[in-house]
Structure formats: C-alpha cells, structure tokens
Amino acid sequence: MPESKLNSPLRYHGIYNAPHRAFLRSVGLTDGEINKPLVAVATAWSEAGPCNFHTLSLAHVAKEGAKEGGLTPLAFPTIVVNDNIGMGTEGMRYSLVSRDLIADMVEAQFNAHAFDALIGIGGCDKTTPGILMAMARLNVPSIYIYGGSAEPGFYLGRRLTIEDVHEAIGAFIAGKIDEHELYEIEKRAHPTVGTCSGMFTANTMGSMSEALGMALPGSASPTATSSRRIMYVRETGKAVSRLLENGVKSRDILTFEAFENAIAVLMAMGGSTNAVLHLLAIAYEAGVKLTLDDFNRISKRTPYIGSLKPGGDYVMADLDEVGGVPLVMKKLLDAGLLNGDVLTVTGKTMKQNLQEYRIPNVPHNHIVKDVKNPIKPRGGIVILKGSLAPEGAVIKVAATNVTKFEGKAKVYNSEEQAFKGIQSNEVKDGEVVVIRYEGPKGGPGMPEMLRVTAAIVGAGLSNVAMVTDGRFSGATRGPMVGHVAPEAMVGGPIAIVEDGDVIVIDVENERLDIKLSDAEIKRRLNNWSPPEPRYKSGLLAKYASLVAQSSMGAVTRPVIK
C-alpha cells in the first residue's frame, strides 16, 4: 500500500510530529521502526477463565511474525467477559454487551493511535465477533487468529465438556447423582487453557473467521495447547504484511458472498445459534445487507454433516485431527454449496486455499459425513416466524430430533424465576417453558439460558420445550427456541403469553405460533404496559437505550435525530 494511503505517516512523520514520536521512542522504538507501517495487535486477554488466559503470549508471537514481515507491531488489550463464569447470574447480562464494547474499544484504540493494519486475537464467545465487527467497521487490512479450544476432559472413561457440568447440576437436583460425583465431573471437565471444546459458540465463531475468509485456512481447529496454534499465530503476523502490500481491506473480503459461505459452514457444522446474531452484526458493520431469511434459504440447501457436540459426539480437537474446518468447506465446495471465488486473507480465493490445503489421509466419516449421506438433510439451524415471533426466532435443530412440539405455556418473567421453578418441580412433561423480559433491551443484554436448559435436560424432562427472547449457550440441546423478536420489553407477542396458552413449535413449516386469535392477541397487547427497566443507570441502562432487536443482530446504534 502506498505511503500516501497509510495512517501512520500523517501522525508520526515530519518535524511537527516530534511529540508523537517521542512517546514511541519511550517504549523502545527506533527511527527505522517508526518509519515502518504500524500494525495493531488487538488482544482479548484475561485471567478470569481459561478462554483468553494464554492470548497475551500469542500476541508476542504474532508481533514476531509481523516484524518478520517488515512491520512494526504494537499490542493493546480488549476487555473479556467470560460467559461460563457469568452464566445464570447478573454477570451474563454483560456478555453480549461486551461484544459491542470490544468493537468500540478496538475502533477507538486503532484510530486514536493511527495504525495502518490490524491483527486480532481472541478466544471466547464475544471476542471473535467483537473484533471482527471492528475490522469490518474500520475497513483496513485485517486478519484474525483464534486462540484455540481446550482439550476435552475425561471421567470414568467418558469424554467431558463444560456442558456436562451444567447438566450434572440438573442430575443432582433430580437425585440422579450425588455431590461427590458432581464434584469429580467439575474437576475434570475443562483440563487445559482454551475455549469450551465442543462446537459451542467460541469454536463456532472461530470457524466463522475461517469461513468468512478473515483467518488463515486451518487456523481455527488446533487446540490452545497445540504447537500448531503457535505456528498459525506467527504466520498470521506475517500475512498481514501481504494484505498491506496489496491494499486488501476487510470489506474486500467481507462481501455478501462471504457471509453466504459462513452461513453454509455454520449449517453444515451444527454450530451455535449465537452465530446468527454475530454474523448479522458483522455484516451490519461491513455494510452488507444480511437478513434472517438468508439463513433459512441457505439452511434449506445445506445438509448438516458435522457430528460435533452438543448435537453430535465429537469435539474440536477431533475435527482438527481429520482436517479441521477446511475439510467441511471442501465437501461443501465440491457439492456446489460454497462460492469459491471470494477473496481471503491469503490473497487467494477460497477455492485456491482449499485446493492447496492438505487434508490428512485418515478416516473422517465418523466426524464429518458426506454431503450425500448427511446426519440431517437440512442445516443445523432454522429460523421460525409466526404469531409468537413476527420478526423471527431461532432453533438449533442439530441438537434436537423434535420437529414439532405443542404444549401449554409455563411462563416466567426472568431466568432466575424459571430456574427456581425447575428446582421446585413446577415444570411438567409436555409443557413449554416461556422465559421473557430477557431480550436485548429487557435483560438487558440478552443473557444465555444455559443454566435453565441444562437443568431441564439433566432432570430428565425430555418432553419439555422452551421459548425465550433471550439467548442460548452453544452448549444447549433440546427443543429450545430463542431470539424471539420482537422481545417482550418492546411489546412483542411473547409479552402477553399466559400460563396454559398453547404454543406450537413447527420446524418443518418454520413456524412459532400461539393458539390465540388475532383479536385476542391484539386485545392483550392493548392492555399490556412495559415493566420498569431493571437498570436506570450505568452500562446496562446505556446499552438498553441503544440496542436493536435480535433479528437485526442486537447491534448498538447511535440515536440520531
């Protein structure tokens, strides 16, 4: 990229920029280093949990790679909110909020210090989408590297993930296991640094970074403890110099076709429903018009082929051994289900990347099926619409075999109320648990309901469904419908559901309905008034005033009159 198009010369070159250069010298930069393009290494790092515990060391490796590529790298941090530690508490309300905060923080630090290019490193659920949103917003040469998943745990010969700990609580409540066994599962479920090992939200979004073309091929699947993780981080540092040299910016890669590819990979792998929110949000920042209808359109034509937890039997480390995300993408490309002509961070097309990537010559059909012999003929996520969700709702069909469910509503106005209801055996087989006022504005922050869904599964309530305007963890399984829009707080129909109302979940017809006449729904809505907001000051109150509905990715938007 010509110097005239770089940001850093305007800030650091020339006699009048001597004060700015003085501060770069203070951190050890030489004249030669100041005269090179400056690359930001945005790193989501935190000791509060294993997901991003190791990313600071990865940042040092990425910087080494960038230096080898002739650049001057400087690292800065972003915040991290650990979803698992916040699960079922007020802390979870900050999870989705942190995604947009991360995007804002990266934008602020990048522009304030006049960087020329961006390397992003993150490990958990919101760090990947937050950094990708910033890359899309900034539209500068950018590349992402995922921090990697943890190795799976083991207990009595059974492979464990964090999902098993949550479900063990439900089993304990139901008297199926004792406190000692719960404790043993807790100690063994997550034995190393890295993200949750199943195809939960973190690994889903790591996979999306590859599928979008924003990360090096094969870089999502090695575990956080793998030496190949270090190799990919170093190569990522080198690769950003080629993007700068060729003038390739993030929006050159983040096209509508790239998002179609990402959705296809999401559907094929049975990834997290949270990816729907995050892809919509990244597209919004990239100026790409992506809608929920695009997800259903691609879901219908894309088979579900990845047997990965929670819907299947395997974890990310297993997928890595047989070829990682490129194995899935190559199968889709060969079947005509991917656009191979899109540009990627390698400077090559997706098709060229997949042709050059060496898939291990080992059996893989137990993990990744053939497109012509899939686990299910349509993708792992379905968008539902109907009288209960006029703007849409999301169900992960990869994690349930239920295609139609009809039952009476058991209504709760918060996740906490619902969890207490399950503890006290209020919920009966055949019912639909409705949890409302947990949407983007109502939560606020659209918290995940894993504590409730895991308690339902763990308690053996196999014939219970759930509908919420909140979110689900990527570890959730069962007939669980989330992201109901409009949410209760803004007067969506979910606000007027009463105990005993009949709710119908119909996956085949993509419907979510309440068995009430239009006149009765209208009458109830006319008599409805919103509750007092849970927060009237602070970050959560500010967020609630700016956030859009889940059908729009729950992005925060400025209020411009």
UniProtKB/Swiss-Prot annotation:
<keyword id="KW-0100">Branched-chain amino acid biosynthesis</keyword>
<comment type="subunit">
    <text>Homodimer.</text>
</comment>
<dbReference type="Pfam" id="PF00920">
    <property type="entry name" value="ILVD_EDD_N"/>
</dbReference>
<comment type="similarity">
    <text>Belongs to the IlvD/Edd family.</text>
</comment>
<dbReference type="GO" id="GO:0004160">
    <property type="term" value="F:dihydroxy-acid dehydratase activity"/>
</dbReference>
<dbReference type="Pfam" id="PF24877">
    <property type="entry name" value="ILV_EDD_C"/>
</dbReference>
<dbReference type="InterPro" id="IPR056740">
    <property type="entry name" value="ILV_EDD_C"/>
</dbReference>
<feature type="binding site">
    <location>
        <position position="196"/>
    </location>
    <ligand>
        <name>[2Fe-2S] cluster</name>
    </ligand>
</feature>
<protein>
    <recommendedName>
        <fullName>Dihydroxy-acid dehydratase</fullName>
        <ecNumber>4.2.1.9</ecNumber>
    </recommendedName>
</protein>
<dbReference type="GO" id="GO:0000287">
    <property type="term" value="F:magnesium ion binding"/>
</dbReference>
<keyword id="KW-0479">Metal-binding</keyword>
<dbReference type="InterPro" id="IPR004404">
    <property type="entry name" value="DihydroxyA_deHydtase"/>
</dbReference>
<feature type="binding site">
    <location>
        <position position="83"/>
    </location>
    <ligand>
        <name>Mg(2+)</name>
    </ligand>
</feature>
<feature type="modified residue" description="N6-carboxylysine">
    <location>
        <position position="126"/>
    </location>
</feature>
<dbReference type="GO" id="GO:0009099">
    <property type="term" value="P:L-valine biosynthetic process"/>
</dbReference>
<dbReference type="InterPro" id="IPR020558">
    <property type="entry name" value="DiOHA_6PGluconate_deHydtase_CS"/>
</dbReference>
<dbReference type="InterPro" id="IPR037237">
    <property type="entry name" value="IlvD/EDD_N"/>
</dbReference>
<feature type="binding site" description="via carbamate group">
    <location>
        <position position="126"/>
    </location>
    <ligand>
        <name>Mg(2+)</name>
    </ligand>
</feature>
<dbReference type="InterPro" id="IPR000581">
    <property type="entry name" value="ILV_EDD_N"/>
</dbReference>
<comment type="pathway">
    <text>Amino-acid biosynthesis; L-isoleucine biosynthesis; L-isoleucine from 2-oxobutanoate: step 3/4.</text>
</comment>
<comment type="function">
    <text>Functions in the biosynthesis of branched-chain amino acids. Catalyzes the dehydration of (2R,3R)-2,3-dihydroxy-3-methylpentanoate (2,3-dihydroxy-3-methylvalerate) into 2-oxo-3-methylpentanoate (2-oxo-3-methylvalerate) and of (2R)-2,3-dihydroxy-3-methylbutanoate (2,3-dihydroxyisovalerate) into 2-oxo-3-methylbutanoate (2-oxoisovalerate), the penultimate precursor to L-isoleucine and L-valine, respectively.</text>
</comment>
<dbReference type="InterPro" id="IPR050165">
    <property type="entry name" value="DHAD_IlvD/Edd"/>
</dbReference>
<comment type="pathway">
    <text>Amino-acid biosynthesis; L-valine biosynthesis; L-valine from pyruvate: step 3/4.</text>
</comment>
<feature type="binding site">
    <location>
        <position position="125"/>
    </location>
    <ligand>
        <name>Mg(2+)</name>
    </ligand>
</feature>
<feature type="binding site">
    <location>
        <position position="448"/>
    </location>
    <ligand>
        <name>Mg(2+)</name>
    </ligand>
</feature>
<keyword id="KW-0456">Lyase</keyword>
<keyword id="KW-0001">2Fe-2S</keyword>
<dbReference type="GO" id="GO:0009097">
    <property type="term" value="P:isoleucine biosynthetic process"/>
</dbReference>
<keyword id="KW-0028">Amino-acid biosynthesis</keyword>
<feature type="binding site">
    <location>
        <position position="51"/>
    </location>
    <ligand>
        <name>[2Fe-2S] cluster</name>
    </ligand>
</feature>
<feature type="active site" description="Proton acceptor">
    <location>
        <position position="473"/>
    </location>
</feature>
<keyword id="KW-0408">Iron</keyword>
<dbReference type="GO" id="GO:0051537">
    <property type="term" value="F:2 iron, 2 sulfur cluster binding"/>
</dbReference>
<feature type="binding site">
    <location>
        <position position="124"/>
    </location>
    <ligand>
        <name>[2Fe-2S] cluster</name>
    </ligand>
</feature>
<keyword id="KW-0460">Magnesium</keyword>
<keyword id="KW-0411">Iron-sulfur</keyword>
<dbReference type="InterPro" id="IPR042096">
    <property type="entry name" value="Dihydro-acid_dehy_C"/>
</dbReference>
